[in-house]
Amino acid sequence: MISAHCNLRLLCSSDSSASASQVAGTTEVVENLVTNDNSPNIPEAIDRLFSDIANINRESMAEITDIQIEEMAVNLWNWALTIGGGWLVNEEQKIRLHYVACKLLSMCEASFASEQSIQRLIMMNMRIGKEWLDAGNFLIADECFQAAVASLEQLYVKLIQRSSPEADLTMEKITVESDHFRVLSYQAESAVAQGDFQRASMCVLQCKDMLMRLPQMTSSLHHLCYNFGVETQKNNKYEESSFWLSQSYDIGKMDKKSTGPEMLAKVLRLLATNYLDWDDTKYYDKALNAVNLANKEHLSSPGLFLKMKILLKGETSNEELLEAVMEILHLDMPLDFCLNIAKLLMDHERESVGFHFLTIIHERFKSSENIGKVLILHTDMLLQRKEELLAKEKIEEIFLAHQTGRQLTAESMNWLHNILWRQAASSFEVQNYTDALQWYYYSLRFYSTDEMDLDFTKLQRNMACCYLNLQQLDKAKEAVAEAERHDPRNVFTQFYIFKIAVIEGNSERALQAIITLENILTDEESEDNDLVAERGSPTMLLSLAAQFALENGQQIVAEKALEYLAQHSEDQEQVLTAVKCLLRFLLPKIAEMPESEDKKKEMDRLLTCLNRAFVKLSQPFGEEALSLESRANEAQWFRKTAWNLAVQCDKDPVMMREFFILSYKMSQFCPSDQVILIARKTCLLMAVAVDLEQGRKASTAFEQTMFLSRALEEIQTCNDIHNFLKQTGTFSNDSCEKLLLLYEFEVRAKLNDPLLESFLESVWELPHLETKTFETIAIIAMEKPAHYPLIALKALKKALLLYKKEEPIDISQYSKCMHNLVNLSVPDGASNVELCPLEEVWGYFEDALSHISRTKDYPEMEILWLMVKSWNTGVLMFSRSKYASAEKWCGLALRFLNHLTSFKESYETQMNMLYSQLVEALSNNKGPVFHEHGYWSKSD
């Protein structure tokens, strides 16, 4: 079977009307949809079908009968109803299927032939329209509702035209009108959603006219208008909201049995509120009338409160207000409601009525267990109006009642404490610490010995803060001790312990408090809200601690606080400032310390702080230029500091590297001028040197690879900087290039880098390389774990060539280079294989002889070594039956013998004798004349 996706292609057409192939495919599409399994192509097929249905009409489907079309439509509709949650079809696609089914059905003439068919079409359009309405597609919803109205009109005509009993006809007309009523309601919903007030109101008024014939729809229309009123009020459309709420009330009155007085009162209260929000001056009377009517319908506390609120908006006299509040008392409203009315009066500056009402309330509810609420509110209102003496009298009254059996509830107690603390905080803010203590003392009096909660410890800390500001140290210590007894793990408790220790000059105690404070901050963040420190930043306490310690001459304590602040603060500027302050304190002290474990610990401490500063510098600054400039300035300071610390670590290379790398990182935030680039290059060079040394000393292959790989990365970065500087033309002869070359060669050689040969190809061609550079390459090439004898040989050849070009030649350096070259070319031992032909090696010996013969400065020990080397080579050749070559090399040794002075007598006799025996043996074709004793070493 062809998939639905493929079939839908038949429906696509560029023409406005459907092609024959389009229509022919429609049947297959629908059949595939309703018979196919849960294919992943189904959602796409539905969407294509929905988009193409607009191009299909009855004329284009002339070859298909009405019965076939109706069957397709019904099957599609029913299939959409059966789709469950396991299908890939969403709710909107189900609506689209219903829509297509309805459009197909409406093309059938049979759908309009019978009343039953028309009713089915009405039902489908109403349902689809409501679904589109709920989905937010109002245009298609309106289209469906219009189609439903048209079908209803057709159905009504058919009812009139046929002859039926009057009773049956009446019932059928009522059914049609009921459907019409629902369609009008839906159309009103759509219009409101689209902001079309005129169309919505016309639909609703039309529904309202139908209520005489459809009384059962009254409640529905009443709630619909109420919902419209709520929605438009939220959107500040007060005029429209007033209309809808008025209609809701009018309609609700038509059927009070189903609506009820509570609902009518609710509508009227919302209407009154709407008038207030619209214009409380212009519509004051309407608002008051609405709320009065609401209270008449159903008296309730919200209605009474709203009425008082409206009265306070107008120019109501105190006498009228007093009458209104007395009415509330006569209605036996609860205490909390009366208190809310009193507060409302106070908030609108009607103090005389408000305080009088409070007095009446107190008398009215004096037997209530919540009578304390009246006194507390009275106290609060007095304090807000600066009537502190009267407020204190009320507090004493509350305390007396509390002590004599009229105890406050927990809720009332919390309320009272909040009022007292608020008043204390106000006094604290204006530095009236004595007055603040009085209010805190009132709060303290209400605590019993078995009620020591966290708020009690907070109270003790607040009192301690006041005592400290009044310089009453002993009382402050007592308060803090009490707080510590109940809440020792509180950051603010530890902060006050710290402050007292600093004031007393007890550095040890202060340090312990700072350490404890840091531990608490590490464990969990405090959300305390004492009078000190910002609530959102517990680390601010560390900043305050550092500042307080400095102000009181406790530098060591301040250093610890700054260190913790830099470690824990998330504030960029705060961390940088803390690190700078700490460094300014520590640098002079560390500079004077002798090399010791203590100095190393201090250096580690500084390194940690500088790394923290680097992390903060790495975080984004603001986009303003000033912020970028500020970061550069900060980085410049830290860069220089790290550099200076690195220089001080000459006895600790590892630590020195850390500071140089840190200086390099800091410099990346600075403008890349020549000075900064040179500094970066130097930092990296020093780091490479340390990493190479670490690699040489590494105890495992893994460690060595790690150090060397890190060095290689640093070398490559350093090379980039050096090449950039060379472009300026002022660093062409910089010795750094040769150093980098040697470093890179050593790293690549010891890492057994496959790119080593290609790297050296460019090295050999570099101009101005010195003999020392080539000799160093030779040494590195043979230094374990590297083993590149051919590279070493080539380097020594180049070095020797450079020595020979010197005028005058440095014969001492020449002799050493020759020694190394010969020793590498012809290793000791009869089993070794030469790295180059002996003819080439012979040339080295001849070259050495030529220089020996021209100067008396050639070191005799080197001449002796060459003599022994050539003699032993001759012996080696003899052992390989290369007799002519043996005679040649031994003869060469005799030539070196002639240039010896102090060592000549020791070797001359024996060598001449052995050489004679060699010549005689060769001429007589005898066996070997050399045995093990024929090999010589320089020490023989």
UniProtKB/Swiss-Prot annotation:
Keywords: Chromosome, Disease variant, Meiosis. It is found in: Chromosome. The keyword Lipid biosynthesis does not apply. GO terms for biological process: apoptotic process; chiasma assembly; ectopic germ cell programmed cell death; fertilization; male gonad development; male meiosis chromosome segregation; meiotic gene conversion; negative regulation of apoptotic process. One of its GO terms (cellular component) is central element. Testis-specific. Not expressed in adult ovaries. Its main location: nucleus. Signal peptide: none annotated. Belongs to the SPO22 family. Interacts with SYCP2. Interacts with PBXIP1; may prevent interaction between PBXIP1 and ESR2. Interacts with SHOC1. Interacts with REDIC1. It is linked to Spermatogenic failure, X-linked, 2: An infertility disorder caused by spermatogenesis defects. It is characterized by mixed testicular atrophy and azoospermia with meiotic arrest. PANTHER family: TESTIS-EXPRESSED PROTEIN 11 (PTHR47083:SF1). Regulator of crossing-over during meiosis. Involved in initiation and/or maintenance of chromosome synapsis and formation of crossovers. This is Testis-expressed protein 11. It comes from Homo sapiens. The lineage of its organism: Eukaryota, Metazoa, Chordata, Craniata, Vertebrata.
